């Protein structure tokens, strides 16, 4: 068969297959055009999930008759001229309108601000139906009907109307986040009207509109610069996380992208603070010279290619980690709201309530008494952060990492307001510390909190090369499968840097000769078995630092004060004081919250006093 030139309509339909995959793709292109035209108000209306109708109206600069005639031709654009090295607009290829016009019924009515009247052009299946004068307000109205009527095979690949409408909503949300100074309105026959009023330069207010007040209450501001690249935005505290990555938003020079490099950097920044299977919530905006990024690498312009990807990744990871360290003792405020919903009592007459038998141990009228002294058996303790237990002989003098825990001070009632986490008032179920704050109370998970403190102390000592070890008087022998022994011995050098000295002890056995001094007495058998299981899943490409911190987190869990252990009031207060000055203390090493805060106003609502 001879080679021949394809018709313009067929060329546009081929292009539409790449650019216009679904109604949301068309909505994205039309909203980008409106933003490039300088619009401050954009209204989107849909019907049938955008398949029957998609209308985008704006108050931008508008077009005259000559512009309209060119706008529906392929590769006609006002946004670039001779180079792709300086793209400062969202659109630039001149493909969207001709692609849409080739597969749908398209009409565009537009009027320039300084013109007395407007014009309208109509296209169906790639054929121009008319170009004529029309009454129009300044700006542009683009109406798309019967999307893919000219290529009916494409309709079979679309999802339900509800799913397609949801995809359009997500596009509008992303655009609204990127452009807070623009008012967005989304309406449709199959949806309630969604409106985002303009917030000017107040990005956090726009976040609250789009992502909800929960995000704005749990967000930490980002503002960092590295060389010629700047990063702004907001990152959620680690305990404010979700079950998928749909709540991660990235923008490059105002362009919404779903770039793998950026998403990977976000995961890396939260690697030590969020449990497996959970995802952080973040909104990142990267600004850089257009010459340093290629936006012409994907038909939908959703991916970009940075000239220096390592610099961008380092900027993102560093900025988020610095922000978390700066404000890292915060925990998500949503936990208190969830607790309020769970505990809000339904009204029930007193006489109809089931009566539990009275017990001296459980009665609320039993006066508070200090917890009994610890058992004589040595355990992980707060002092263990800086003092080895009696059963070990330190190899060299331990570094006093946490003086606040080693020298606890009582908290007088009148000084409660000086401390963010308040003063300990009780321990319940030998696991949770109840503290009174100036305007409410805090409930602390003692094991999760101490685990984080131990981990941060180990990491600090590790980075300063002053991590003390303790020589065991009698080495602990741990029997494990031979393949686990092999894996452990491959990483013996990494363990040694953390104060854990191991060696072979015959077939299927490991001898533990030294443990980190700050952990006190450690369950060596449990620790070694857990390490053997976990290092089997290590990424072989991970650096030494990442591996050491991974091991430190596991050790911290085994060396922390356990659930079920009674604490004295001064020990509880010591834990609270150390949490207040320790980065990341709002969540444990597995990403769970270490404390929940209840405001006095929340408590009063429980009793109907608000």
UniProtKB/Swiss-Prot annotation:
Any single biological process term in GO: mismatch repair
A cellular-component GO term for this protein: mismatch repair complex
Gene3D superfamilies: 3.30.230.10, Histidine kinase-like ATPase, C-terminal domain, MutL, C-terminal domain, dimerisation subdomain, MutL, C-terminal domain, regulatory subdomain
Region spans: Disordered: 351-406
InterPro entries: DNA_mismatch_repair_CS (IPR014762), DNA_mismatch_repair_MutL (IPR020667), DNA_mismatch_S5_2-like (IPR013507), HATPase_C_sf (IPR036890), MutL/Mlh/PMS (IPR002099), MutL/Mlh/Pms-like (IPR038973), MutL_C (IPR014790), MutL_C_dimsub (IPR042120)
Entry annotated with the keyword Flavoprotein: no
Keywords tagged on the record: DNA damage, DNA repair
Stored Pfam families: DNA_mis_repair, HATPase_c_3, MutL_C
GO molecular function: ATP binding; ATP hydrolysis activity; ATP-dependent DNA damage sensor activity; mismatched DNA binding
Function: This protein is involved in the repair of mismatches in DNA. It is required for dam-dependent methyl-directed DNA mismatch repair. May act as a 'molecular matchmaker', a protein that promotes the formation of a stable complex between two or more DNA-binding proteins in an ATP-dependent manner without itself being part of a final effector complex.
HAMAP family: DNA_mis_repair (MF_00149)
Family, similarity comment: Belongs to the DNA mismatch repair MutL/HexB family.
Protein name as it appears in the record: DNA mismatch repair protein MutL
Species of origin: Rhizobium etli (strain ATCC 51251 / DSM 11541 / JCM 21823 / NBRC 15573 / CFN 42)
């Amino acid at each position: 068969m001879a080679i021949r030139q394809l018709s313009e309509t067929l060329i546009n339909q081929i292009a539409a297959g790449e650019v216009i995959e679904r109604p949301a793709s068309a909505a994205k292109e039309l909203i980008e055009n409106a933003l490039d035209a300088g619009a401050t108000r954009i209204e989107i209306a849909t019907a049938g999930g955008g398949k029957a109708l998609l209308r985008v109206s704006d108050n931008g600069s508008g077009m005259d008759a000559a512009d309209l005639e060119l706008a529906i031709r392929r590769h006609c654009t006002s946004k670039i001229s001779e180079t792709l090295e300086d793209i400062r607009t969202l659109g630039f290829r001149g493909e969207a309108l001709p692609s849409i016009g080739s597969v749908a019924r398209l009409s565009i009515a537009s009027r320039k601000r300084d013109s007395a009247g407007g014009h309208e052009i109509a296209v169906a299946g790639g054929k121009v139906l008319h170009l004529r004068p029309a009454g129009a307000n300044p700006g542009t109205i683009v109406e798309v009907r019967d999307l893919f009527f000219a290529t009916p095979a494409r309709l079979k690949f679309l999802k339900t109307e509800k799913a397609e409408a949801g995809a359009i909503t997500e596009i509008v949300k992303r655009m609204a986040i990127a452009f807070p100074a623009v008012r967005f309105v989304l309406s449709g026959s199959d949806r309630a009207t969604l409106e985002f009023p303009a917030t000017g330069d107040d990005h956090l207010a726009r976040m609250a509109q789009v992502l909800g007040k929960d995000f704005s209450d749990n967000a930490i501001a980002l503002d960092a610069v590295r060389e010629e690249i700047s990063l702004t935005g907001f990152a959620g505290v680690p305990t404010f996380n979700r079950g998928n990555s749909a709540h991660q938003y990235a923008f490059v020079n105002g362009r919404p992208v779903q770039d793998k490099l950026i998403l990977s950097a976000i995961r890396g920044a939260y690697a030590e603070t969020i449990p497996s299977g959970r995802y952080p919530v973040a909104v990142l905006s990267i600004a850089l010279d257009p010459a340093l990024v290629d936006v012409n690498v994907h038909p939908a312009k959703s991916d970009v290619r940075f000239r220096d990807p390592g610099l961008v990744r380092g900027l993102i990871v560093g900025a988020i980690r610095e922000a978390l360290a700066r404000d890292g003792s915060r925990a998500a405020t949503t936990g208190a709201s969830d607790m309020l919903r769970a505990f809000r009592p339904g009204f029930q007459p007193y006489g109809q309530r089931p009566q539990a038998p009275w017990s001296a141990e459980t009665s609320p009228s039993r006066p508070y008494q200090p917890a009994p002294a610890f058992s004589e058996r040595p355990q992980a303790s707060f002092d263990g952060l800086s003092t080895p237990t009696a059963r070990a002989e330190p190899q060299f003098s331990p570094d006093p990492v946490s003086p606040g825990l080693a020298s606890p001070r009582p908290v007088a009632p009148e000084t409660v307001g000086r401390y963010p986490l308040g003063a300990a008032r009780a321990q319940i179920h030998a696991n949770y510390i109840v503290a009174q704050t100036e305007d409410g109370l805090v409930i602390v998970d003692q094991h999760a909190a101490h685990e984080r403190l131990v981990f941060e102390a180990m990491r600090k000592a590790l980075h300063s090369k002053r991590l003390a070890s303790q020589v065991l008087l009698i080495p602990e022998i741990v029997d494990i499968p031979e393949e686990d022994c092999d894996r452990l011995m491959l990483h013996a050098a990494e363990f040694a840097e953390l104060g854990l000295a191991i060696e072979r002890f015959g077939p299927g056995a490991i001898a533990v000769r030294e443990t980190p001094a700050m952990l006190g007495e450690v369950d060596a058998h449990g620790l070694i078995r857990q390490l053997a299981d976990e290092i089997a899943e290590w990424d072989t490409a991970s650096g030494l630092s990442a591996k050491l911190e991974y091991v430190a987190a596991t050790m911290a869990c085994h060396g922390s004060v356990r659930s079920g252990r009674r604490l004295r009031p001064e020990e509880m207060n010591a834990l609270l004081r150390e949490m207040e000055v320790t980065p990341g203390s709002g969540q444990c090493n597995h990403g769970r919250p270490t404390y929940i805060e209840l405001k006095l106003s929340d408590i009063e609502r429980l009793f109907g006093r608000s």
